[in-house]
Amino acid sequence: VEEFADKPGVIGFTVTSTRYKPVHANEYMRLYSMIEETGKPIAFHAGYHWQDPSLATCNSFLGMHALGFAWCNIVHMTNWVLNGIPERFPKLKSVWIESGLSWIPFVMQRLDDQYLMRMSEAPLLKQMPSDYMRQNCWYTCQPMEKSSEVGLKATFEMINAKTQLLYASDWPHFDFDAPRVIAEIPWIDEE
């Protein structure tokens, strides 16, 4: 951060899927503070590997690809919010990349539900987990899951897509999103 924050073209910092320490480990707090001071976001880029014990029982690329990218960010988001990172670093923007969008409403609802029963396990929170996810987090469209227009519309509403959705292509991967992926959604206006 110290070396690159002021370099031309640096617009933020990316963390690939962590496989060593969770995102709430104290070792990262200085890093989060430094990134927050730059005013630039931290981005979590989803990624999976076949050796992840929680995904090792998937026996096809289809299953692993469908679950793996979302699973990484589900775990990171859960730890990010419940451990009060948005409270500790209120000006730190987080971006959640390449895990699609459909997992977000599930995590919002599930965390809110569980939080209401166990608030003592998340003592740093001053609002509902979903509120942090709607206000302090941005999400990339890639891959845009368009198989259910009803589901996508509900997701857009829940994440406050008008302000929190970012375009990402993931070119040249096979499942990249061309710009039209957003432009062709019939209920989205030019704004």
Predicted feature residues:
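Active-site gating/metal-coordination segments in enzymes
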Residues: 1-76, 83
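H/E-rich (His + Asp/Glu) clusters that bind or coordinate divalent metals
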Residues: 46, 52, 58-84, 88, ...
